[in-house]
């Protein structure tokens, strides 16, 4: 694949009209605490197998993108990556306790779907700009189709984020049977 010129990269990144909030994004302490026991818990009641883990960068900003079958998927992706991932998540996950506490205190990004998720995309910018990992489900919701095509149409957020950060690797993750 040919590389884009610097002028082309500059045009691409400016044309998506995506900027951050300017606020520092940190991985909260609760996320770090959960990293200590969630992998053991997940392995105790699931039969998870991973392939291709050698393709996951261990340093720098990364966009993790993939299908979404169940509420376990973010945990599975974090377990596979062995890195903190900050996911774009629908506002419904932030409305009631204890979910709200967990989502806020593990660094997940609240996405208001009806407004197009502009605030969430700005926070996604902040995550990547600071060299952290972003998780996104391009369909914007869980896949519930039982026959081909299994996936729903994707949203534009992943394309806009990837265009704004063309040097950040996008790691596709496929989950079966969650």
Predicted regions located by residue number:
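A transmembrane-helix-recognition feature enriched in membrane-embedded lipid enzymes
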Residues: 2-51, 76, 97-106
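Soluble catalytic domains of membrane acyltransferases
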Residues: 27, 44-178
